[in-house]
């Protein structure tokens, strides 16, 4: 039978046609996929971003700070904008970014500033920090040298303060500002020095010295700069400002680099790099021990091009000389062409120096970045970023010397240059001394507001930091704050609302469609050269539509789409660099900011909530075990005298009324704590005294009870004292057989009666 059934099954299977799945249709995208495009300074256009790795890995080098002074708002714009770009590329597009940034701690500006600071400090010390006549004479000499060097004055040199003031009052200052951006800085320096010279006797010496510093240090450096030989002088200044820069970046929530490189730690590699360029035929040494890059030979090479970022600036001597540094010798330097730039500088007296094949010297500015970037990232790098003011000659020289070193055609694939920052229309610069430091800005604006301001303008465009921009930023910030608080409140309400309908009405469907459209717009914005202004505008519009839905839907609103929208907005803001709350329903509150979020509410109320929660737990435990009323009262005393007092809250009990609540200063709290401690100490002392008295009573009672054990008829049975007794045990004769006197008998009788009474008190009457 089993054989028959198996055969039948086999026949059925063989005779049944083979079952196949229906054909699956490949989905056809409704639109072409949007790809990430970046504005590349090497093409001056937006081009598709294609990492050389062919996968998710991206190599990125960014020019870091030259650390000789406080970082200003121009630096903030650059580093925050680059940080935003980096975050979007790695956190939105999902690339694995290896981000390298340098610290320039060997540079003409650093050498000069360190040297001048040292010399000026010594100048002050040598004069016992007194702004005396000797100081005034020196400052006057320095002042007139400064005036005649930095101002173009027709006729003879300025020799008196009156002559300068007369010239300045008649000068066309507006034209002079246009001709020389440093004109206002020089005027301020001179006027400060004149104030100290003329009013120094009535000024604080420290203030007077500080006002003459700018005009005095050039003369001191000219006279004594060459005598500086201690290398520690050139290390202390950059080390100090490097730490300050890092502190500023932390305040602005800028991500730290994957790798940080310092020039001072790369001198051997720089020497090797320069030698390789010489070996490849694109550099030459001069008689003084310097090495220059041969721009003409490089540019004539069929495989190379010079000045790829800004070819129109090729030959601009003012830019070239500025890039060479203020300590460079522009006359008779042995260069083949004025366009050539230093790879290695022969050190002069008063400058730091390192041994090299060409003599004692130090690295040129441009070579530093090439060496450090290549050491970590190799001969071909995906992205290089920095401020637009570095494009020529710095970045163009970087490209040239790196491509000369590796003898390749393209060292960098994408060059991203952030735009200038202007304050109310004026460019900021350390060299112009018209800058607002980051720390000064943070006293007026929160880190969030600064980041919003930078994100509100396309990263490669000029940004004018003015009142109208701040107004827009604060408006956006308030709108987001209100939206986040509303969604969190609605979420809390929904949690206690019980069973509600989940079905989407046309209102929810419309909101969902707006949400999907916004996601698409944000994606397109990020693909379009990381356009944060468009992305932020899209988020703002989505908030407006969500608020409209909340108003229209009323009590029938569905919380799910609102939470999804709020979480999405939070995610995008987090990607741009705004920290978010743990619940992802809004950005995190900022300590010390006045942003409408009232700081961290959780941090503020948590100690009080914990106090209340602990009190509740204790009351509940006592109630469960049916404790005595006094135990509950002890709890109320504890929360009043300890828990709330530790939180600077005092409760004053009042007859027939609720307790009076008082908030205490620390001093007031300490005073109450002191009084409570004294009260507690007094109570302990009383308790101790009571215990001691009780102990004494118990001791006396024990002694009395011990004494009571003796029967009255036995109390005088001491044969050393007495020899005869009556029937009650009272002595009748003393030890010598003499009769007891009447007075003694009376006394003994009294003692006997007392003992009888004591004995009967404890043991009853003897039967």
UniProtKB/Swiss-Prot annotation:
Family: Belongs to the class-I aminoacyl-tRNA synthetase family.
Modified residues (Phosphoserine): 326
Protein name: Cysteine--tRNA ligase
Binding-site residues for ATP, renumbered to this chain: 430
NCBIfam families listed in its UniProt record: cysS
Gene Ontology cellular component list: cytoplasm; cytosol; mitochondrion
SUPFAM superfamilies: Anticodon-binding domain of a subclass of class I aminoacyl-tRNA synthetases, Nucleotidylyl transferase
Residues given in the record as Zn(2+) binding sites: 63, 369, 394, 398
Cofactor note: Binds 1 zinc ion per subunit.
Chain residue ranges for the region called Disordered: 683-712
Reactions accelerated catalytically: tRNA(Cys) + L-cysteine + ATP = L-cysteinyl-tRNA(Cys) + AMP + diphosphate
EC number: 6.1.1.16
Record motif 'HIGH' region, residues: 65-75
Key words of the record: Aminoacyl-tRNA synthetase, ATP-binding, Ligase, Metal-binding, Nucleotide-binding, Phosphoprotein, Protein biosynthesis, Zinc
Span(s) of short sequence motif 'KMSKS' region: 427-431
Obligatory cofactor(s): Zn(2+)
Molecular function GO labels: ATP binding; cysteine-tRNA ligase activity; metal ion binding; sequence-specific mRNA binding
Cross-referenced CDD domains: CysRS_core
Lineage, broadest ranks: Eukaryota, Fungi, Dikarya, Ascomycota, Saccharomycotina
Origin species: Saccharomyces cerevisiae (strain ATCC 204508 / S288c)
Keyword hit for Phosphoprotein: yes
Residue ranges of the TM segments: none
């Amino acid at each position: 039978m089993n054989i028959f059934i198996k055969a039948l099954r086999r026949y059925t299977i063989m005779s049944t046609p083979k079952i196949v799945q229906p054909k699956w249709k490949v989905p056809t995208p409704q639109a072409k996929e949007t790809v990430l495009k970046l504005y590349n300074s090497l093409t001056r256009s937006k081009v598709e971003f294609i990492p050389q790795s062919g996968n998710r890995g991206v190599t990125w080098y960014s020019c870091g700070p030259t650390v000789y002074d406080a970082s200003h708002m121009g630096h903030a714009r650059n580093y925050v904008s680059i940080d935003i770009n980096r975050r979007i590329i790695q956190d939105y597009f999902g690339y694995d970014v290896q981000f390298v940034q340098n610290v320039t701690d060997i540079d003409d500006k650093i050498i000069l500033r360190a040297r001048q600071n040292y010399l000026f400090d010594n100048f002050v010390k040598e004069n016992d920090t007194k702004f005396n006549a000797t100081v005034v004479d020196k400052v006057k000499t320095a002042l007139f040298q400064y005036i005649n060097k930095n101002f173009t004055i027709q006729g003879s040199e300025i020799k008196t303060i009156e002559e300068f003031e007369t010239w300045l009052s008649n000068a066309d200052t507006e034209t002079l500002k246009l001709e020389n951006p440093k004109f206002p800085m020089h005027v301020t320096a001179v006027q400060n020095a004149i104030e100290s010279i003329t009013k120094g006797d009535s000024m604080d010496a420290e203030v007077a010295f500080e006002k003459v510093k700018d005009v005095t240090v050039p003369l001191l450096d000219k006279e004594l700069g060459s005598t500086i030989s201690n290398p520690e002088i050139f290390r202390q200044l950059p080390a100090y400002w490097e730490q300050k820069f890092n502190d500023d970046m932390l305040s602005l929530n800028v991500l730290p680099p994957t790798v940080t490189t310092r020039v001072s730690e790369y001198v051997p590699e720089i020497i090797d790099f320069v030698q390789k360029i010489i070996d490849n035929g694109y550099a030459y040494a001069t008689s003084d021990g310097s090495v220059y890059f041969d721009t003409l030979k490089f540019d004539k090479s069929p495989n190379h091009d010079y000045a790829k970022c800004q070819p129109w600036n090729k030959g601009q001597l003012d830019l070239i000389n500025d890039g060479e540094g203020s300590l460079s010798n522009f006359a008779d330097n042995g260069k083949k062409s004025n366009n050539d730039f230093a790879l290695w500088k022969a050190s002069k007296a008063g400058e730091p120096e390192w041994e090299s094949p060409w003599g004692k010297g130090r690295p040129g500015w441009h070579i530093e970045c090439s060496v450090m970037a290549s050491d970590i990232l190799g001969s071909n790098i995906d992205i290089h970023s920095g401020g637009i003011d570095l494009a020529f000659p710095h970045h163009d020289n970087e490209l040239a010397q790196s491509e000369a070193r590796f003898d390749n055609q393209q060292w960098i694939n994408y060059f991203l240059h952030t735009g200038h920052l202007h304050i109310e229309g004026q460019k900021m610069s350390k060299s112009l001394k018209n800058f607002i430091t980051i720390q000064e800005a943070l006293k007026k604006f929160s880190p969030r507001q600064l980041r919003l301001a930078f994100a509100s303008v396309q990263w490669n465009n000029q940004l004018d930091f003015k009142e109208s921009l701040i107004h827009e930023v604060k408006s956006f910030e308030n709108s987001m704050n209100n939206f986040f608080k509303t969604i969190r409140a609605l979420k809390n309400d929904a949690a206690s609302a019980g069973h509600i309908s989940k079905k989407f009405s046309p209102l929810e469907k419309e909101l969902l469609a707006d949400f999907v459209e916004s996601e698409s717009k944000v994606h397109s914005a990020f693909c379009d050269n990381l356009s944060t202004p468009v992305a932020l505008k899209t988020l703002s519009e989505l908030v407006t539509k969500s608020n409209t839905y909340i108003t229209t839907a009323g009590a029938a609103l569905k919380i799910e789409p609102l939470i999804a929208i709020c979480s999405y907005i939070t995610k995008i803001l987090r990607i741009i660099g705004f920290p978010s709350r743990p619940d992802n329903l809004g950005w995190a509150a900022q300590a010390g900011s006045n942003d409408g979020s009232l700081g961290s509410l959780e941090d503020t109320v948590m100690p009080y909530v914990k106090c209340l929660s602990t009190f509740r737990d204790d009351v509940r435990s006592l109630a469960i075990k049916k404790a005595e009323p006094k135990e509950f009262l002890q709890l109320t005393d504890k929360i009043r005298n300890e828990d709330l007092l530790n939180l600077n809250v005092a409760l004053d009990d009042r007859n027939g009324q609720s307790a009076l609540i008082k908030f205490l200063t620390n001093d007031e709290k300490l005073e109450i704590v002191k009084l409570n401690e004294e009260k507690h100490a007094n109570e302990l002392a009383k308790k101790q005294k009571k215990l001691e008295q009780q102990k004494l009573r118990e001791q006396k009672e024990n002694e009395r009870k011990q004494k009571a054990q003796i029967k009255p008829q036995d109390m005088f049975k001491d044969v050393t004292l007495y020899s005869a007794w009556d029937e009650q045990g009272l002595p009748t004769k003393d030890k010598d057989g003499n009769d007891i006197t009447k007075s003694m008998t009376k006394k003994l009788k009294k003692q006997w009666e007392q003992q009888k009474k004591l004995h009967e008190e404890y043991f009853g009457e003897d039967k």
